[in-house]
Amino acid sequence: VSGGGLVQAATVLAATTRIRVGVGLLPAAARNVAFAAMEIASLAQLHPHRIDIAVGHGMPSWMRSVGAWPKSPLTLLTEYITLLKSLLSGKLVHHDGRYVRIDGMRLHESAAPAAAPAVLAGVRGPKSLALSGHVADGTLLAEPVTPAYVREALRQIAPTRPHRLVAYNIAAVDDDASAALAVVRPALEVVGEMDWRPHIAPLPFHDDLVTLRSRCDGPQEFAHALPDEWVRQLAVAGTPQQARSRLADLFDAGVTSAVLTPVGTDYLVSLDSLAAVL
């Protein structure tokens, strides 16, 4: 289990003055939406215009392990995002839904942020992406994000109003491109698992990747066997120029914000190397 996103965001916001911080993501079934709105509003009030929130289904295996996986994840997420946005906007909320019930609540004027933070949907399946296009301010795509996946996701989102698209990717930069590929390779061991098929389906090597995973005893063997060309497609990795080119391709495809996740044995050194891309 990873660390708590809101606590980490609060720490980073308190230690900085300019950078924008995104929380990605809050599982809808894990928090009462009214209390989540109170916590988020506090962050947005203390650090105006510097916080964005993504809400999603959460990892199914994690949510099931604590008895929190709903019968209809789509219904819960629709209700949750809609009501969270209303609460953060200072509206009086009445709702008696399948999963969320609120009987006349609004944030007190002393607690409401001057500007409501954006609420994105962190999703990957076709129905969930369509949901995001209807109710969210944007979509957060988990890694790996390729230009082909971006185009397919936008087709399914079908936004009819301004809609942000945030893309996560594993990243490593080195003057030796092969060294960068070696660093990101272990972090790609999950992409052969079923939950990541929506990311891989638009790629020309999808069938070959599925076959490779079926022949490997486990994720580590699979990651070790990935061809270098596939690794280049599944991460932002290589020389600074190659990384910049990859990011340009993602922005051209429709990404509005790119989030790079450093990997390796020393994250601070990795961050310094990523700075060469900027």
Which residue stretches match the model-derived regions?
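Active-site-adjacent structural elements that line small-molecule/cofactor binding pockets in enzymes
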Residues: V1-L278
